Amino acid sequence: MQTPKNSDVLYLPIKQVYFDEIVSGVKSCEFREVKEGITANKYILRDSSGKYVLNAECTEADTAYFLDDYNGGKFPFMPKPYRYLYLAVGYAKERDTALVEVTGYSFEPYMIRKDREGKPKYAFWVIAYHLGRVVELHRKQLSL
C-alpha cells in the first residue's frame, strides 16, 4: 500500500470499546459532532478565502448558511475529503492504533430546534464516517 499523505488522514482519539468494535468489523461508522471552531475546522472543507465550501446540491449561492442551520435536513457544507481515519485509543504513549479506510460520509441532524411556527430551523450536526477495511493495526505491548 502507498503511504497516505497527511491531508488524506484524520487523527481521532477513541475509547477502547469503540476501537475494538471497529477493528472487529462490528462498528462500521464513526460519529463526530460538528461544532463551530476547532472541530468544524477539522471536518469541514474551506476555500482559499477561509470560508466553508457550500454543498451545491442543497444550497443556494446567494444565501448565507451557518453550521447550525437545519436546511431542510441537509447539511449545507462539504466535508474534507479524508481517505483514512487514524484511530488512537486515549492519549498515552503506548496505545492501540489503527489506520482505517473511509468509504464515505453522511451528516445527521440531532437536537433539532424549531421556530415559532413549529418548523425545524436549527440543528446540531454529526458527521458519520463510513468505514472500510483496517489498513494497519498496532496493539500496545502488554507489560508483565
Feature-to-residue mapping (PLM):
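Structured alpha/beta reader/binder surfaces that contact nucleic acids or chromatin modification marks
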Residues: T3, S7-V9, P13-L144
